[in-house]
UniProtKB/Swiss-Prot annotation:
Annotated NCBIfam families: alaS (TIGR00344)
UniProt remark on cofactor binding: Binds 1 zinc ion per subunit.
Subcellular location per the Swiss-Prot or TrEMBL entry: Cytoplasm
Protein's job: Catalyzes the attachment of alanine to tRNA(Ala) in a two-step reaction: alanine is first activated by ATP to form Ala-AMP and then transferred to the acceptor end of tRNA(Ala). Also edits incorrectly charged Ser-tRNA(Ala) and Gly-tRNA(Ala) via its editing domain.
GO BP annotations, alphabetical order: alanyl-tRNA aminoacylation
PANTHER family from the UniProt entry: ALANINE--TRNA LIGASE, CYTOPLASMIC (PTHR11777:SF9), ALANYL-TRNA SYNTHETASE (PTHR11777)
Lineage: Bacteria, Bacillati, Bacillota, Bacilli, Bacillales
Reaction catalysed by this enzyme: tRNA(Ala) + L-alanine + ATP = L-alanyl-tRNA(Ala) + AMP + diphosphate
The species this protein was found in: Listeria monocytogenes serotype 4b (strain F2365)
Gene of this entry: alaS
Protein's name according to its UniProt entry: Alanine--tRNA ligase
GO function terms (MF aspect): alanine-tRNA ligase activity; aminoacyl-tRNA deacylase activity; ATP binding; catalytic activity, acting on a protein; transferase activity; tRNA binding; zinc ion binding
Length: 879
């Protein structure tokens, strides 16, 4: 067997399939582009769904890729097994209606066994097949020459993820030999069983059926091939590594952790788990941040935060007690740089994000320790012997506190932990995550009609909004028709069209179609599978027929406003990078006639000063009257110019470059103004955060910007009129009013305090004594909870002692507060427990600390009864 590095294995795979006529697709970013069904790109096929369901026809039906992927459905096993990972690479080859089972099997066998490529011993290879897939069995037996004892039938070998393409699959296994298992009585010791001897290295999926919505299976119009080979597993075999972690993909990271920790790998199982967790998780986090994800409390950001915190917790096993994960980023970048330069190119930014998150987590751990101390203290004060599962889970989930650490502290205080309760909380979280998580979601049922419409249609709308053309196809209800009449809708493909199809964030053009016999409106334009512009129309008059000569007219006003917003979007993109940093990447956009919306990655908030600067930069470029130059050129030449490419987009060899002078250079297929002066004016309407590490700016240009400014000016004039001042002096007038209001509030609070003090004399007079404990339980007049707290403060100041419960009616609600003196707490009384009982008797709930609690109720009529219960409760405590 050859000795190969991981980079060499990856490159050999891609070179092999390139030699076999495949287009090598670039690895897509981990954050899905226009696919809300998944949190992460989690396989090679996840980026190919549009080809498999026929919604897009690829230029070459043969494709291959090395796709970085993230899966997080089994995080707790990472580090504890030989091959669980959250980040991994999937090597795959794909055929869309080209070669099928024979081609896939022959290619796989040649790559694995030929001395030119991997050069495995054929006797070491086994395959599994679906029992009913006689064709695959025959090919393995007769075409490849495998003996029957190397072909294993397994019922699960059928790939089906719901509606859409599905079919049998065939997996290839490598026999690592008796050293990894030779117990003949082991029922799992076979290719496809749970064992370490037979490692699955490649899965060949034969998509030959449509899984229909009614549950039936019908043959696909075009059969497809989808294969997946895990690079980490493949490399572990080639490098003769016991687990994936001893390969050159992980060991440099582990060696760096050894240096930081001063602890050696391979001497302790507990330590080795920590090394593996750290090595796995830093790869995931570094690549995910590089691709635009950021730690947060939701979605993919929550997963990153969880992985970072898990790694930091395991680092404590290695006596690492300070931020360190950020130091591993350059190592990850160096390992992967030959194929994935993005981590090395963004090392500083990725390190900054990780270090900030680590520092916050170390602070959070300290907060968690303070919370735990409170929990332990409360448990002792209330004579509880067990720390509740809900408390353990909160410490674990919110503060990253390991259960074992909580247990150690509990034991030090003579307490036990509720493991069953904790596991129940964990199960609930897993169930929530499972319901929210999506793997490769089902695709659309593969269609045939549009995929078979191959006659080309040219877009001629860059320089013209009117054009005379010919109707090539008319489609109604997924059927080709000869004509469509007034009152009906249809889809149309023309020989040439000036109508822009929605793409790159720019909305589709609208307009009219006129023939000698009919009139129709264009409502929408999208790309058909074979890249023609597909127009959705509604026929208003007469009849349109296939072959008709028609006059196509784009709505010029809407197009004019749209292109202003599109060029302004390019200016804004460049201005964001200049103002906030080069880490800013486009995460989505909308360019319509009335506004533009731009989503982008950014770690942190944007200040008012930065927004002002952005507006100034864009408007300066507008007023400089810069010519917009658009040309097509080879992609290599565009890159030399420094052209910005959209993150996650795929480009051909020839690209369209939009240059706004030397200021902004982007690859773009959209329509633009000829000169920035055409934009007129640019105004930012809003800036918000829309998710973890993603911000959104909405803006307007031209007439809409003028309208926006006018509305703002009118609002200011109205405010000035109400304040009886000028627009210029309005801010000072508002400041004066705010100062006056603060003074009134201070006087009001002082008055309320005096009233509460005066009322306290009556409220606190003659408290009831029950078994030597002073008890006050009364209804009072208090406008809110703040005033009730003032009564409690007065009670404390007067050092009355004992137990206080006060209730006040506020509209249809009840406010309740209770307080217990230090002596009463020592005697076993608890304000929170008392108030919970009182609140339930007037339709509410609540609780709090032993010394003070507050609650609310929904039944004012029962407040008197609830307060009467206080005496009963005190007597019950004394019984």
């Amino acid at each position: 067997m050859k000795q190969l590095s991981s980079a060499e294995v990856r490159q050999l795979f891609l070179d092999f399939f390139k030699e076999k006529g495949h287009t090598i697709e670039p690895s897509a970013p981990l954050v899905p582009n226009n696919d809300p069904t998944i949190l992460w790109i989690n396989s090679g096929v996840a980026t190919m769904k549009k080809y498999f369901d026929g919604s897009v026809i690829p230029d070459n039906p043969r494709m291959a890729n090395a796709q970085k992927s993230i899966r997080t459905n089994d995080i707790e096993n990472v580090g504890k097994t030989a091959r669980h990972h959250t980040f991994f690479e999937m090597l795959g080859n794909f055929s869309i209606g080209d070669y099928f089972k024979e081609g896939a099997i022959v290619f796989a066998w040649e790559f694995l066994t030929s001395p030119k490529w991997i050069g495995f011993d054929p006797d070491k290879l086994y395959v599994t097949v679906y029992p009913e897939d006689e064709e695959a069995k025959t090919l393995w037996r007769e075409k490849i020459g495998l003996s029957d004892d190397h072909i294993v039938e397994i019922e699960d070998n059928f790939w089906d993820i719901g509606i859409g393409p599905s079919g049998p699959d065939s997996e290839i296994f490598y026999d690592r030999g008796p050293a990894f298992g030779d117990d003949a009585s082991d029922p799992e010791l076979y290719p496809g069983g749970e064992n370490e001897r037979y490692l699955e290295i490649w899965n060949l999926v034969f998509s030959q059926f449509n899984h229909n919505p009614d549950g039936t299976y019908t043959p696909l119009p075009k059969q497809n091939i989808d294969t997946g080979m895990g690079l980490e597993r493949m490399v572990s075999i080639i490098q003769d590594a016991p687990t994936n972690f001893e390969t050159d993909l992980f060991m440099p990271i582990i060696r760096e952790v050894e240096q930081i920790a001063g602890v050696k790998y391979g001497h302790s199982q507990e330590n080795d788990v920590a090394f593996k967790v750290i090595a796995d998780h830093i790869r995931t986090v570094a690549f995910a941040i590089g691709d635009g994800a950021l730690p947060s409390n939701e979605g993919r950001g929550y997963i990153l935060r969880r992985l970072l915190r898990r790694a930091v917790r395991y680092a404590k096993v290695l006596t690492i007690n300070e931020p360190f994960m950020y130091k591993l980023v350059p190592v990850v970048g160096k390992i992967m740089n030959s194929f994935y330069p993005e981590v090395e190119n963004q090392t500083d930014f990725i390190q900054k994000v990780i270090r900030t998150e680590e520092e916050r987590f170390h602070e959070t751990l300290n907060e968690g320790l303070a919370i735990l101390e409170t929990i332990l203290k409360t448990a002792k004060e209330t004579n509880e012997q067990i720390i509740k599962g809900a408390d353990i889970f909160k410490l674990y989930d919110t503060f990253g506190f390991p259960v074992e650490l909580t247990e150690e502290y509990a034991e030090d205080h003579g307490l036990k932990v509720d493991h069953a309760g904790f596991e129940a909380e964990m199960k609930e979280q897993r169930d929530r995550a499972r319901s929210a998580r999506a793997d490769v979601k089902s695709m659309q049922v593969q269609g045939e009609l549009l995929a078979n419409l191959t006659e080309k249609s040219a877009f001629v709308g860059y320089n013209s909004t009117e054009h005379v053309s010919e109707i090539l196809y008319l489609i109604q209800d997924d059927t080709l028709v000869e004509e469509v009449a007034a009152g009906s809708e249809a889809q149309v493909i023309f020989k040439e069209t000036p109508f822009y199809a929605e793409s790159g964030g720019q909305v589709a053009d609208k307009g009219t179609i006129e023939s000698e016999t009919g009139l129709a409106y264009v409502e929408d334009v999208q790309k058909a599978p074979n890249k023609q512009n597909l127009h959705r129309i509604s026929v208003k008059e007469g009849v349109l027929k296939t072959g008709d000569t028609v006059k196509l007219a784009v709505d010029k006003v809407k197009r004019r406003e749209t292109i202003k917003n599109h060029t302004a979007t390019h200016l804004l993109h460049r201005a964001l990078k200049d103002t906030l940093g080069e880490h800013v990447n486009q995460a989505g956009s909308l360019v319509s006639p009335d506004r533009l919306r731009f989503d982008f990655s950014h770690f942190g908030q944007i200040t008012e000063e930065e927004l002002t600067k952005l507006e100034e930069i864009v408007n300066e470029k507008i007023w400089e009257q810069i010519n917009v130059v658009i040309e097509e050129m080879p992609i290599a030449e565009a890159k030399e110019l420094g052209a910005m490419a959209l993150f996650g987009e795929k480009y051909g060899d020839i690209v369209r470059v939009v240059q706004v002078g030397k200021y902004s250079i982007e690859l773009c297929g959209g329509v633009h103004v000829r000169n920035t002066a055409d934009i007129g004016l640019f105004k930012i309407v809003s800036e918000t955060g829309i998710g973890a590490g993603t911000r959104r700016i909405e803006a307007v240009t031209g007439k809409e910007a003028y309208r926006f400014v006018t509305e703002q000016e009118n609002t200011l004039k109205q405010a000035a009129s109400l304040l009886k001042t000028t627009t210029k002096e309005t801010p000072q007038k508002v400041e004066q009013l705010q100062a006056d209001l603060r003074e009134v509030k201070r006087e009001n609070e002082s008055l309320l305090s005096k009233l509460a003090s005066a009322a306290s004399a009556d409220i606190f007079e003659s408290p009831e004594e029950i078994g030597g404990v002073k008890v006050i339980a009364k209804q009072v007049n208090a406008k809110d909870m703040n005033q009730l707290r003032q009564f409690v403060d007065n009670w404390k100041d007067k050092k009355i002692g004992g137990i206080l419960v006060l209730g006040a009616v506020q509209g249809d609600k009840v406010n309740l507060i209770s307080a217990v003196s230090e002596e009463a707490i020592k005697a076993g009384y608890h304000a929170g427990k008392l108030l919970k009982e009182v609140a339930t008797r007037c339709g509410g709930n609540g609780g709090g600390r032993p010394d003070m609690a507050q609650a609310g109720g929904k039944n004012p009529a029962e407040l008197g009864t609830a307060l009467d219960y206080v005496s009963t409760w005190v007597k019950e405590q004394q019984a």
